[in-house]
Each structure stands twice: as structure tokens, then as C-alpha cells.
Amino acid sequence: MSMDISDFYQTFFDEADELLADMEQHLLVLQPEAPDAEQLNAIFRAAHSIKGGAGTFGFSVLQETTHLMENLLDEARRGEMQLNTDIINLFLETKDIMQEQLDAYKQSQEPDAASFDYICQALRQLALEAKGETPSAVTRLSVVAKSEPQDEQSRSQSPRRIILSRLKAGEVDLLEEELGHLTTLTDVVKGADSLSAILPGDIAEDDITAVLCFVIEADQITFETVEVSPKISTPPVLKLAAEQAPTGRVEREKTTRSNESTSIRVAVEKVDQLINLVGELVITQSMLAQRSSELDPVNHGDLITSMGQLQRNARDLQESVMSIRMMPMEYVFSRYPRLVRDLAGKLGKQVELTLVGSSTELDKSLIERIIDPLTHLVRNSLDHGIELPEKRLAAGKNSVGNLILSAEHQGGNICIEVTDDGAGLNRERILAKAASQGLTVSENMSDDEVAMLIFAPGFSTAEQVTDVSGRGVGMDVVKRNIQKMGGHVEIQSKQGTGTTIRILLPLTLAILDGMSVRVADEVFILPLNAVMESLQPREADLHPLAGGERVLEVRGEYLPIVELWKVFNVAGAKTEATQGIVVILQSGGRRYALLVDQLIGQHQVVVKNLESNYRKVPGISAATILGDGSVALIVDVSALQAINREQRMANTAA
């Protein structure tokens, strides 16, 4: 049975992505004056592994690019080339082009020829300069790059026998073919599950292992030195050779493999399917629990006890499955050291980036959606927040600005903060700009309320538009995207001191801790993280305002009242506030009182997408299935107050 090596493409793509990310992280912290040997070795190993895999799968453009970079890295780690900032920048640029080449191969396309020619010429030029050769040698760069240095070729090594054992059906012929692509094989011996051949001494064992490990494991590969003599001896029996393999190599491989973390790659679609099935199981368990609660405990005690155990097991299973989708914030944070470094250099600023809480976990779907909003906030802090070095010195600050990205869990939420010690927000300029755009403003507004004006559509106080920011099309999009994820944005700023933008998000979109409330015969779910408290209002605490609006006084704070029955036109609800219950909700830094008929209870619900199953409903974010099989709507807390205001204004105009 033949085996198609293209079956292993995805494995190479996944590993190459990880290796390129590791390479970038090491390059960003590499000190050119005194480079750390371990970091240089790690960068070299990453390039070496990518080159080997690219050669195996015939990705010649990526292989050649990586080969040129690998040679330079080898010279640097041997101390034959002195690093500087320009060289590290070139390595980072090479990494970017390698990523573009890899992405092209993923799409079954050929990489861009112009960028390939450009980066190859740049790397070859650097190689010439490192050797002290003149730029006039460019005419023969291609020959120089593709041929190994003469002194290295002269270092002949003894031929070696490679022994591959425990092979699967089809792998014997496949691996023989792949080895033939790397070098010339002699004295080939093939068994049912083994392969043996003599290799010339001009190819490194690491190169061979790097290629073969995309198909088999490292402990299936053994090398033996073959003594050079006029007469080639008969190859040893494969099984015996495997048993008599050099002890040191076997022990080293076992040690290496024992230190590796055991993990498998699973498609996200399979995880999502598993989560959906567990969600259905939880709903079924909830239905059974509701039915069993109606039974007589005396006659059905064992059944009720078993139902309690089932509930605990279902909850544990749900939490375990949900944890599979959780990813560390490091996945997001890892892209910002490069962004800050490049953008700060472009703007002529000095910035030190600090990352806090990289191990904090968040649902994969939210991780992917938070990248763009967070990137905009980081760019905004660099462009508008942190000042130029001379301005910072004039203000009595350190010339190096500080930018902090942090993440931490707060209950069932994650709090992500972007903090800078820059100029802060200019209250007067924001108010003037807001007034000129027709926004409702007042001098009595608090600093936090003024700061939230920057999230208005089209709002920008930038004196000039740059390719970094300044068009006013970003901050409102940031806010809307965060709200779509079930979160909200807060901002705190002090002029001359700095700004902190805080993003609060639920840990997952699949499970929700909610408070169920009743309005007439309808049941609604309020996200528990938005619920502050609940109370029954007194007539003395209710105060009318112009336009039919009422506010509720709670410990000296006046909160607008939103009547849920009015928002969704629910018939038969309690219309008098003193007869119902108000739930104090907080969203987007603002609080209001939501009038409902009755509180039912607090529980976890499985979130079902309403838009894909029905249509988008203003004021409703999703739906869920209750224990009795009925459907309850999950309220969009951030949208309710605005909908209530629009309805009241429409009624007044009519």
C-alpha cells in the first residue's frame, strides 16, 4: 500500500507556525551586544527544523530562504559574525517573509517571487559582508549561497548506516524515496517493517532526523558508523543492529522523549461538536431534575439521590469539556512585542512593553475575536498616548514610556487592561470636539463620562491623520465588537499621567451563569455578572422626570428605570413598580434599574444562538432551553437602556 506524503502537510504547517512564532519571540529579546547562546541556538534549531521539513515536502522557496538564514545564524552562534540591530531587523523581516511563503503553500500557491529574490539578495549580501568580501561579488552570489563553503566540504566524515525500525505498511518504500531525495543511498536492505542503508558522510544526522520525524518517531531511527575499508562488509541483521545501537544515543532519545509533553492535535470542529453534545446532556439532565423534584422523596429516595449525583457529574463533565476550548492569553499577547517595537521605532518613541497574566485563559472563539480590538488600543496608546522622548523629559518623566498589557480572572469574567503612562486624555479638547460633532455634552459630566466620548462614531482629537490612527473609525468599532462578545469597555484617564482602558469579557460564550426572571408568562435570563442587587421599590423612592421617564433612588443614587414589559411589549405584566421587583444592572460603566414581575432563581444555562436559528432581535443576545423544555431569551443588558430611550422618544414624538 502506497502512502501519499501530502497527508503530512498539515503537521508540517502546524509545527512551522509554532517554530516561526518561537523564532520571533527569541529575536525580539536577543541583545545584539551580548547575545545569549541559548537564544541563538533556539533560533537556529527552529530555522533548521523548518528547512528540513520544507525540503521533505518540496517547498523549495521556503527551504532556500531558511537555508540562507540558517547559515548566518550558525556563524553568529559560533562567534564568526557580530550581531547588531540592523541584522536582527533583517532576521525579523526574513521571518515575516518565511511566514508569507508558508501561508502561500497552505493555499497550494507559489510564494511571491519578488519578495523571495529581495530577501535572498539581502541575506547573501550580509553573508558576504560578514566574511569581509566586497559587494562586487554580487554577480556570483547565487553560486556562493547554493554551494557549501570549501572548508566544510573538505571535512569528510565516515559513512554511516541508518536503521529505521517498527515501520508501518507503506512507510518502507516512502522513507526510502525520501532518503533518496536527500542523498545517495547504497547497500539498501528492506524488511517488512524495517529499512537499512548506508549514507555518505556529507549529510548531518540532524538533517536526516528532522526530515524523517515528520513521518516516524525519533526513537525509530538509529545511526551506526561504518568503517571505511577496501571491502564493504555485509550489512548486519536489522533486529540485531537495533538492539546493539549505541547506548548513549538511545538514552539521550529516551530522556528527550520523556521530557516532551503528551498532547494531540484535535480539530476545533470536533471540540465544538463535543461541547454541543454536553450542552444537550445538561439540558436533558435539567429536565430530569425538574421531573424528579415532583416525586415523593419517601418512595423515590434512591432515584432522587441518583439524580443529584447525575447533576454533579454533568456539571464536572461540562467544566472539563469547556476547559478544552480555553487558551492562554499568551496567544494574543505574543504578537505585541514585535508590534510595539516596530511602531515605536516608526514614531520615534521609546517604549517598554510589560505583559502580565499571559497564562490567564479565555475561550478560543473570544481569543480570536479580541485580537483586532486589542491591537487597535495598543496602536492608539503608542500614537496618541505615549509622548516623544523630548516631551516626556520636559514633563519630568522618564524618556522611555511604559505600556502594560494585563489579563486576570474576575469571577466569571476576564479583565484585560491596556495601560500607558502617556499624556492622558485632554478633557477640554474632547468636550469641544464632541460639541462640534453635535454630541450632547455638559461641563458637569464626570471625567469617566467625558472619556467614554472617544468611543462615539467618527470621534478623533488627532491633529493630523496618520497611517497609524487618527481617522476616528476605530474606537467605536472596538466598543461594538466588545459588546458583541458580551463584554463592555471602561476607561480611566488623568491628564499628564496616563490612560487605562479596561475590557471585561465572559470567559466563554457557550455557558452562562444567569438570573432567571419572569414577566407575565415569559421567562428571561439576565447575565449574572451584570446583576448588582435586587429590591422591591417604595413609592417614596420613585421620582418622575420630563417625558414620562422615572428614576429610582437607591442610597442617594438616582437610577433610570427600564420596564422590561414595555421593551418587549409583554401583555399581562405588572405595570406598577411598587408591585414588582427591580434588578439593578450595570453595563458599560453605567447602572440602571430593570423592572420585572418576579425573580425565579440563579443557574447555569447553555447558550443557543438565536440569530442563526430564528433572526436577530434587538435587546436579546441569545436563547436557552429551560429544564421544562421551554425556551427563555437571554437579555442584552447593554442594549436595553438605549432601546427603552428610543421607544420613549418615539412615543413622545407621536
From Swiss-Prot:
Q: What is its main location?
A: cytoplasm
The reactions it catalyses are: ATP + protein L-histidine = ADP + protein N-phospho-L-histidine
- SMART domains the record matches: CheW, H-kinase_dim, HATPase_c, HPT
SUPFAM superfamilies listed in its UniProt record: ATPase domain of HSP90 chaperone/DNA topoisomerase II/histidine kinase (SSF55874), CheW-like (SSF50341), CheY-binding domain of CheA (SSF55052), Histidine-containing phosphotransfer domain, HPT domain (SSF47226), Homodimeric domain of signal transducing histidine kinase (SSF47384)
Q: Name one GO molecular function term.
A: phosphorelay sensor kinase activity
What keywords sit in the KW lines? Answer: ATP-binding, Chemotaxis, Cytoplasm, Kinase, Nucleotide-binding, Phosphoprotein, Transferase, Two-component regulatory system
Source superkingdom:
Bacteria
Entries under Gene3D superfamilies matching the protein: CheY-binding domain of CheA, Histidine kinase CheA-like, homodimeric domain, Histidine kinase-like ATPase, C-terminal domain, HPT domain, SH3 Domains
Residue ranges occupied by any HPt domain in the UniProt entry: 1-105
Q: What does this protein do?
A: Involved in the transmission of sensory signals from the chemoreceptors to the flagellar motors. CheA is autophosphorylated; it can transfer its phosphate group to either CheB or CheY.
- From the Swiss-Prot or TrEMBL record, give the protein name: Chemotaxis protein CheA
Lineage per the UniProt record = Bacteria, Pseudomonadati, Pseudomonadota, Gammaproteobacteria, Enterobacterales
The primary gene name is cheA
